[in-house]
Amino acid sequence: LCFSGAYTKPQVKKLLTGKATRNEKLALSVIFGAFGIAGTYLGVPVQNAIANSRVVGVALGGILGGPMVGFAAGVIAGGHRFLIDIGGFTAISCGVATVAEGLLGGILYAKLKRKPFDPFAALITGCAVEVVQMAIILLLSRPFEAAVSLVHIIAFPMIVVNSIGLAIF
């Protein structure tokens, strides 16, 4: 509902047409970062980590607003994720992954610019950014065995649910 409501805002309409000012993009970065934070809190605790939908807000910010919006939203939501669990098993990896997901959403935006929103491209982007997140968890989280166990449990549901979430928005 929050995402649907965002579409009615003039700033989001400007973002979709490529006419948003720098200040409007900054404000929208905060909004999409807040959506990412909400995705963290709506997540489910799994093995000292959080299976979440943080990527939907962050990647969507990148898809709709480009790399600057995606990156900034990723820094906001990823920084929050790190700060709520400093020293946690996945704090660093999930924080880094969130920034990467925003940037990847922004890269897709560059491909879609001045074209209608493409749900299939958003679905593929969702799959790609979630795979990147799982890879970052495996690369940065320790102990490695715990990271493998976590990814084994959360990868499929997070890839499917978050990809569909991006596509239907």
Name what the model sees in each region.
Residues 123-127, 154-159:
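Transmembrane helix-bundle signature of multi-pass membrane transporters/permeases
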Residues 46-51:
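Short helix-coil transition sites and intra-membrane helix breaks within transmembrane domains
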Residues 19-26, 148, 152, 158:
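Membrane-water interface of alpha-helical transmembrane segments
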